[in-house]
Amino acid sequence: QAGGDQTILKVIEQAYGKLDYKNHFYLERGPYVLASVVDESDISKDPLILKGNYIDLFEPNLPVLKQKVVNPDEQAFLFNIDAVKNKKKPQVLASASRQYDEQTGKRSYSFIAKSPAETNNVMRILLPKQPKNVKVSAPTFISEWDKATHTLLLQFENNPEGVQVNIEW
């Protein structure tokens, strides 16, 4: 029925109070953030600007961002590093693999990463301190430390049998 949505909105406003209309959807579940800005809105054409320490899960290299701008007709899937409860505990925050046999020592963290062959792994690992030694059983790997978030970016070729990762700080 034409105009039925206005009737429903009036009933909701009477029951709950003033409604705040926005051009975006925003959802947090634990450290995960989903955001979408619609371009069909008469309310606003403004982007949604999120500030904090985020890993952009839609980007293949898992960049760390201080700010994410979500424009109309765009979506974002982020990991909020600031929402991690125990930042002293080494942990994989985002990865293109499953981790097995995780071992945490006073100054070390190790695990086996398994994922399909002929694919690349990109992972971001939260560590209590900057690593002094990183060993990966893959033929080659790239590691990059982000001082501001205490996260280590690791990239290497996956192996379904497992890639051993050993980190010491």
Where would I find each of the regions flagged by the language model?
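Solvent-exposed beta-strand/loop surfaces of large extracellular or lumenal domains
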Residues: 51-67, 135-155
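Hydrophobic, well-ordered secondary-structure elements that form the walls
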Residues: 35, 111, 134
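Proteolytic processing hotspots in large secreted/extracellular or virion-associated proteins
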Residues: 104-121
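A conserved amphipathic helix/loop scaffold
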Residues: 1-104, 123
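Beta-strand-rich interaction surfaces with strong enrichment in secreted/lumenal proteins
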Residues: 66-68, 100, 111-113, 152-157
